[in-house]
């Protein structure tokens, strides 16, 4: 069996009246318990990770699922999830979906996920946020790297 750093993926979409997000689809691998918990949930604007991502209008990352606004923190930690990254998708100004990537690392596997950003008018893109788990050298390198336009 192959073990990957990304353990689960969810796609949340607005309800017909656009007041909440509902789970459209998800891939949970062997995380049946977490899938069952997730299937019945909905998130209002600015609620939980999908809702907060909707409100922020840009990707968000949680590196501690148990001590945050993450609604399924205890369940996530029970199945070995260590971080979550939410990415909004827009059509014009309207939210089309929020993708949530769940990651998990342990003593035998190392992985990282990064969010990069270049502020308007800034020619350099730099690390905005990242979860590196045990990849300390990689984290140091990422935090001290910038990319010019069309480079990297």
Set out the residue ranges of the language-model regions.
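Flexible loop/coil segments at beta-strand boundaries within sensory signal-transduction domains
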Residues: 90-95, 107
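A short, aliphatic-rich beta-strand micro-motif
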Residues: 82-90
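Short beta-strand-to-loop transition segments that serve as allosteric relay/switch motifs
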Residues: 98-106
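Short hydrophobic/aromatic beta-strand element in the GNAT-like acyltransferase core
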Residues: 8, 86, 98
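Regulatory sensory and allosteric helical modules in signal-transduction proteins
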Residues: 17-71, 123-152
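Interdomain signal-transducing alpha-helices
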Residues: 57, 93, 116-119
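Short N-terminal helix-loop-first-beta-strand/juxtamembrane motif that initiates sensory/input modules
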Residues: 2-13, 109-124
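Short loop/turn motifs at secondary-structure junctions and domain boundaries
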Residues: 41-44, 75-81
């Amino acid at each position: 069996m192959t073990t990957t750093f990304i353990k689960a993926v969810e796609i949340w979409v607005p309800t017909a009246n656009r007041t909440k997000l509902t789970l459209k689809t998800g891939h949970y691998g062997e995380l049946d318990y977490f899938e069952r918990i997730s299937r019945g949930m909905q998130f209002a604007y600015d609620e939980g990770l999908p809702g907060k991502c909707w409100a922020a209008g840009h990707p968000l990352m949680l590196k501690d699922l148990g001590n945050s606004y993450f609604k399924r923190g205890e369940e996530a930690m029970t199945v070995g999830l260590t971080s979550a990254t939410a990415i909004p998708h827009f059509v014009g100004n309207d939210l089309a979906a929020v993708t949530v990537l769940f990651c998990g690392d342990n003593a035998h596997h190392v992985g990282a996920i990064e969010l990069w950003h270049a502020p308007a008018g800034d020619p350099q893109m730099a690390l905005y946020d990242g979860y590196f788990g045990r990849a300390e050298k990689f984290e140091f390198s990422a935090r001290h790297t910038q990319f010019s336009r069309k480079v990297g």
